[in-house]
């Protein structure tokens, strides 16, 4: 039998070379996000600043994984998540953090008008004018003929501008700024498939901050 053995002393803590939320995105519309952690010699990790784990004292060590799905705390705003790793002999890294903004708000669209409730394709009676504004800054908007008051933005038919209608689509509208729109009878007829009738016209806005559409 041998009269000796080898004993390794390891006092070097592992490091975290990269830590991101949703691949470095600045905004998320969901509380469920994916953490990406790059580290050498990590055997375990603990994460805090998430739902149910407010501080490091609340966090528990778990097996290290380079990718981890977590739930952010509720409520819109800036969210900072922290991670720390340790090796197999409990040398701990410094904490690393990453920040993302949770934004789940959708624009509220308010219509003023219209000036008339019936139009034809005859000059002098062929234009409906209204305006709208948004509670949030928009990156896009569209005016559509929809099947129901509660239709979503991907329902219905986009009203065109071939007949002279204006501002049926657009980009970059500041919050609380009024935008005037005109619907011409020929464009309404095209969207309606040429059939007379009473139709629901709805304006949809897409928020600049998170790309969510109004309801």
Where are these regions (language model features)?
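Low-complexity, disordered linker/stalk regions enriched in Pro/Thr/Ser/Gly
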Residues: 1-215
